[in-house]
Amino acid sequence: MSIRARVEDAEFLWKHERYEGAFLSALSAVAATARLRYPDRKTTKDGDAFRQFLKGGKGGELGVEFRGDVHSIEHIFYKWLRCELVHEGGLPVDIQFMPDASPGALSIRAGGKPEFILKLSHGWFHYLLSLVANAPENRGVFEQ
């Protein structure tokens, strides 16, 4: 299987409203692309490669309050989305997806009482796929 197949799987699952599976496939494509960018497993662990790849996709640092601490968005995607989906088979109960406020918006809602739920807009899914598709490491992979 290839990174392109992971992206196609993600898009198929998303179209059929299987959001967790779609995110898992998208995050798998991110992880595989990150490993292409940072191939030395001795100097760069999987989680570090994943976070560094995501950090390279945007300017600045985005911190989000979650579970009583402020975490980078890259850490949230790695620890509480990628790792939970891979190792536990689902998202934590305190993370949910929400529709975009406007098309393509990257929104995060860190809820306080009574919910204490972190909500991520659908735009994040599309953002992850665009990072993978536009990564120099994947040049030619997505061209028809």
Model-derived segments and spans:
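Long, charged low-complexity segments
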Residues: 55-144
